[in-house]
Amino acid sequence: MNAFDYWSIFRGALATVTLSLASIALGVPLGLGLALIRWAKVPLLNRFVIGYVSLIRSCPAVTLTLLIFFALPQFGISLDPTPAAILALTISTAAFNCEVWRSALVNFPREQYDAALSFAMPRALRFRRIVLPQIWRASLPGLVNEMTLQIKSTPAVAVIGIVEITRAALRVGARTYHPLPPFIFALVLYGLIVYVLIKTQRVIERRQSIEGRP
């Protein structure tokens, strides 16, 4: 492998990070919104969310990507590969994040919510000041675990022409006839990305534990 080959795979890593960050930034709050619908048992919407989560969690990322990229034009909606990839990854991770958030909401002490209600605290303020900080702490490990899975799901979008780490390594291996070095380099890059994510989680948890001390 020469410098150009390394750079090609590194550019694939940049694409992986971009797709992951975009879909995570959209999927985490979307998952929270879906979980709140489940928690509040909103009529009709609750059934829709249950069906959505069950369907998407059982659908492979590559199938979802192909469906979005090729089916949406049938309804007059055409997306370039990158927006289509972000949409597919967002839809997928939102379903998994919904269950992470919902688990934290189910285990949230209802007495605290009722106590805030007795003080006539507005609903938005109750959620922002009492519920969200606690479910965020409880959900963080599960959310980060889903983020790592999201990063490892990005090769699925290569089917619509996105050149991420794995696709870039495959191209270099096919061009050089030596597949092992590019895939070892790809493995190192995946490891570094996940390592940074886990270190960020630990920093956040450490800061939260310090802030929570009396």
Regions found by a protein language model. Name each.
Residues 1-214:
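Transmembrane alpha-helices and adjacent helix-loop boundaries
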